[in-house]
Amino acid sequence: MNRNIETFRIDWNGISIEIRWEPRWLGMDIGYNTAHIEIESIAPERAHLPITETGYRSHFTSPDTVAAYGGPVAFVEAWLETESQAPDWRRAEQQRRQLSLF
């Protein structure tokens, strides 16, 4: 079984992120095309992102969905931007940036 995993790096709000994209997950065609995308913050290592508190996210989707965004990088950037508008993320981000004296 030949696997085709593409790797991309982006910078999002000062966080370096690695995107690993496998358009045909495990090379399987089982009547539904399954793609796999992994998102990991690498600098700072495992930094929180709006789509994951651990800095890592594994996501299965359709390759057509990702293609509709213009590819894996555009898909992840759109996902991050959308989720970064959520009130919980904005509050948490503000708290992380706030200096603490204790």
Model feature map: region roles:
Residues 3-35:
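Amphipathic, interaction-prone secondary-structure segments
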Residues 38-102:
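Acidic, low-complexity intrinsically disordered segments
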